[in-house]
Amino acid sequence: MKITGLTRRVDSLGRIVIPKELRRMLHIKEGSPLEIYMDVDETIVLKKYSQVGSLKNISQAYAQSLSKVTGATVCVADREEIIAAAGKNHKKYIGKALSKELEDIMDKRKSALYSKKDNNLIPVVKDDKADCEAQAIAAIVHDGDSAGAVILCACDEKGDTPDIAEKLVSAAAEFLAEQLG
């Protein structure tokens, strides 16, 4: 389906400029990986590439295992959306675009704990309110770049996420980063 038709020239180095409006609409940032391939009718296609998206099945299995062990909702995200989720509230996360706050955490390439008690919970996806009691978030770092994140949302009344939860999501992030190559 064609949304808009654009004509661009290829420069002497083989580069094609993608207009800023189109990059903004498609959430393509500087340094974003793109797949380039040809269709059968000799059409050149540019497609956003998700490293973590290629691990969807492994991510889903890991999220289910971690959710069973912890009793929490566990999500795995690439740079754009939640690609795998398991647990009580998994349906409200799967396939949804990430919140700006979560993107900022992934850009920092760290792991962190958040709790309702400390009043620092963040929304995981856009247009979502942080309705869990505690969160543990770890960035999936591959080749020095953030490729996604593992998010654990605990909804028990205690409202505290022990340090072990941060270690669990960090271990999951490390495992998925290793799977990327």
Model-derived segments and their meaning:
Residues 3-4, 68-71, 132-134:
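Short, small/polar residue-rich loop motifs at catalytic or cofactor-binding pockets
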Residues 7-84:
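Intrinsically disordered, low-complexity terminal regulatory regions
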Residues 40-42, 102-118, 169-180:
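Short, solvent-exposed cationic patches
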Residues 56, 60-65, 98, 102, ...:
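Juxtadomain coupling helices with adjacent low-complexity linkers
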Residues 63-129:
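Structured interaction and signal-relay segments at domain junctions
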Residues 134-141:
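A short, aliphatic-rich beta-strand micro-motif
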Residues 144-145:
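Glycine-biased flexible loop/turn sites that connect beta-strands or occur in inter-domain linkers
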